């Protein structure tokens, strides 16, 4: 028997509102910002996301064995090329996305967190 349910995945960042807007656009969600240091993104299929201000935030580096990425999000998409175009237009950057034969591509969000666009 479970003792808990999963709430939102909370992501540290320097600008919660900006990063929430990025993911809301990618996922088709809605930004809820009652406090500028904590911003929620809801209204899309899947686990909700929350973004919290982190003073002194240092983004992860990809790939780097001596400094872990700590987590990444797998975002399931129908059209990899269209999703990549949209993600890049919203401020993502490519990390490992040149091999078009794989079923995933790795990017960084505007705050530097890695995420994957996955065919699915």
Predicted regions: what is each one?
Residues 27-28, 91:
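Glycine-centered loop/turn motif at secondary-structure junctions
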Residues 56-62:
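A short, acidic/glycine-rich surface segment
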Residues 2-8, 14-16, 33, 40-41, 49, 68, 73-111, ...:
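Vicinal oxygen chelate
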Residues 44, 52-56, 120:
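Generic beta-structure capping elements
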Residues 1-20, 26, 71-77, 118-119:
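N-terminal beta-strand motif that seeds the catalytic metal site of vicinal oxygen chelate
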Residues 36, 44-46, 66-70:
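Short connector loops at helix/strand junctions that flank enzyme active sites
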Residues 48-49, 60:
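Short, charge-rich, low-complexity interaction segments located
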């Amino acid at each position: 028997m479970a003792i808990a349910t999963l709430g939102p995945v909370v992501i540290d960042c320097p600008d919660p509102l900006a990063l929430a807007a990025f993911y809301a656009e990618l996922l088709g969600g809605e930004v809820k910002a009652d406090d500028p240091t904590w911003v929620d993104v809801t209204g899309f299929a899947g686990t909700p996301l929350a973004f919290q201000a982190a003073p002194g935030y240092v983004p992860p580096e990809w790939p780097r064995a001596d400094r872990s990425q700590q987590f990444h999000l797998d975002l399931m998409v129908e059209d990899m090329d269209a999703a990549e175009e949209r993600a890049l237009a919203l401020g993502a950057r490519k990390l490992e996305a040149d091999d078009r034969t794989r079923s995933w591509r790795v990017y960084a969000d505007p705050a530097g967190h890695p995420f994957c666009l996955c065919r699915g």
